[in-house]
Design a protein with these regions (language model features):
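N-terminal glycine-/serine-/threonine-rich phosphate-binding loop
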Residues: 1-43
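Active-site catalytic loop in hydrolytic enzyme cores
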Residues: 3, 84-91, 95-101, 110-189, ...
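Catalytic metal-binding/acid-base residues of hydrolase active sites
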Residues: 16, 50, 109-110, 175, ...
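Cys-nucleophile CN-hydrolase/nitrilase-fold catalytic domain and related Cys-dependent amidase chemistry
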Residues: 22, 34-127, 197-199, 203-213
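Short beta->alpha transition motifs characteristic of CBS
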Residues: 52, 59, 123, 135-139, ...
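Structural detector of well-ordered beta-strand residues that form the stable sheet scaffold
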Residues: 105, 167, 216-218
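Short beta-strand scaffold segments in enzyme catalytic cores
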Residues: 106-107, 121-124, 157, 219, ...
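C-terminal beta-strand edge segments of enzyme domains
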Residues: 222-346
Length: 346
């Protein structure tokens, strides 16, 4: 592990978006980024799918074997307000990160350029505004599969910072043991766990991750009210029976020993600040280092496939291998042996 800068000041943005309104939510997020930066935050972390929102409780009219035309209209609103990467939308976030002079991790619903699929995505920007990482959620959970596709590339990016490597897994990805180990293999010292999940067991999970990885775990959750849903929805019955506060926060920072550095904050919007003592990370690994001295790679091995099979096939098909037969002198062959191997007569 490289030498780590002693302290990292972080900010957790526990809040709700302007639901289903991309532009207004980006404007809100930019203000929150700049506020946190003005208060000294060097790393600013948002929840899962903050832009344009997490569609809590919605099915968009899908049932097995049937689709509702009005639910399709609501889905189209969600589609239209999702974020293309890169785009002017990400440029606005990048500018805010640069103005704050901070690393920014933010959850979005991404609209793919290559098709009409939506993804639950986490972006990390650098303090200069550069987009450093994009992670698409590997497997949407339950009914999330009605609106998000499986992540298909760049699944485990980490960002090298003065405080070590930062990486993110989204919500229930953190229940996937091999996904966690993939981040440990990449040397994460600050493990981001953005989500929209407030069940009681979740805090057991993030504490376990901190102990297992001997890293800081940053859990940041949304806080929003049922009244925040748009009033012009075509299927309002889908959210009318939700709890008054479907998602009520509970964001917290866990230290490398599994203890709360900041206790969970419930039922309110709040920017939560914490100063991470980064020297505790290597110190905590004295007796347990998950991918170091407490591992047995000769017995147990993790293989991470980070290649997109579709893109690999396209690249294979388009590559000019120079295997065409030619008449006369073959200009593409520099040595006679190559010509002979390619059945050329030049």
């Amino acid at each position: 592990m490289k030498d780590l800068k002693d302290t990292c000041r972080i900010a957790l943005i526990q809040a709700g978006p302007v639901m289903f309104d991309k532009d207004a939510t980006i404007e809100k997020a930019c203000k929150e980024i700049i506020e946190a930066g003005n208060n000294g935050a060097e790393l600013i972390v948002f929840p899962e799918s903050y832009i344009p929102c997490y569609p809590f409780g919605l099915t968009f009219g899908f049932t097995v074997g049937n689709r509702d035309k009005y639910g399709r209209l609501d889905w189209k609103v969600y589609y239209d307000n999702s974020v293309v990467v890169p785009s002017e939308d990400t440029d606005r976030l990048a500018d805010a990160a640069a103005q704050a002079g901070a690393y920014v991790s933010i959850g979005i619903t991404e609209r793919a350029l290559e098709n009409a699929t939506l993804y639950c995505t986490n972006l990390i920007f650098g303090p200069d505004g550069a987009l450093l990482a994009r992670h698409r959620k590997l497997k949407p959970t339950g009914a999330e599969r009605l609106c998000w596709g499986d992540g298909n590339k760049g699944e485990f990016p980490v960002v090298d910072t003065p405080w070590g490597n930062i990486g993110a897994l989204i919500c229930w990805e953190n229940y996937m043991p091999l996904a966690r180990v993939a981040l440990y293999e990449k040397g994460v010292t600050i493990y981001l766990a953005p989500n929209t999940n407030n069940n009681a067991e979740w805090h057991d999970t993030i504490k376990h991750i901190a102990i297992e990885g001997h890293c800081y775990v940053i859990h940041v959750n949304q806080n929003f009210h049922k009244d925040d849903y748009p009033k012009n929805f075509h299927c309002p019955h889908e959210y009318e029976n939700l709890p008054e506060r479907p998602c009520n926060g509970g964001s917290a920072v866990i230290d490398p020993y599994g203890h709360y550095l900041t206790k969970p904050v419930w039922d309110k919007d709040k920017i939560i600040y914490a100063d991470l003592d980064m020297q505790q990370v290597p110190a905590s690994r004295m007796e347990f280092d998950a991918t170091g001295h407490y591992s047995r790679p000769d017995v147990l091995e993790l293989v991470i496939n980070e290649h997109d099979p579709v893109e690999d096939l396209i690249e294979f098909a388009e590559y000019d291998y120079g295997l065409e037969e030619c008449d006369g002198i073959c200009e593409s062959c520099e040595e006679a042996a190559e010509c002979e191997a390619y059945n050329c007569e030049g």
